[in-house]
């Protein structure tokens, strides 16, 4: 099973005072300087949506957002175009992109140190219900590959994989 359109979300450690609007000029500066090897296009404000996407940096290859989906603030990387290579290659690409964005936000002086993303928990999902439906059979088919990827990445540190059972949700 080929994983494409991988999403990675890293959650905020704690920033109850963070006003998501403060992220808008930062995302605009990322567009102006084209800091990534991706085409970044626009910024959208969805703060009015409860438990929603928050502030979204729209790109051609991927979107970045500081979102509040599931009522948990975090940074979400949403890959939209295909990535070549193996499933571990694609997982690595998505995780690397999400971590780089987190590090850049954490280091941005305009946020005055208000933002810190945890590294001990993350959510990985596949935004393609046709390629990877959220069924137990999908999980069983790719679980060994995902376990191997994270075991290698974490150098033997214990970790727990879990899957959302609701077939209406994305696989993850």
Protein language model features and the residues they cover:
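C-terminal edge-of-domain segments
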Residues: 162-172
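Short glycine-rich, basic-tinged beta-strand/loop micro-motifs
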Residues: 4-8, 116-136
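Ampiphathic alpha-helical segments that act as solvent-exposed interaction surfaces
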Residues: 22-30, 83-109
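Intrinsically disordered, low-complexity regulatory segments enriched in Ser/Thr/Pro
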Residues: 61-89
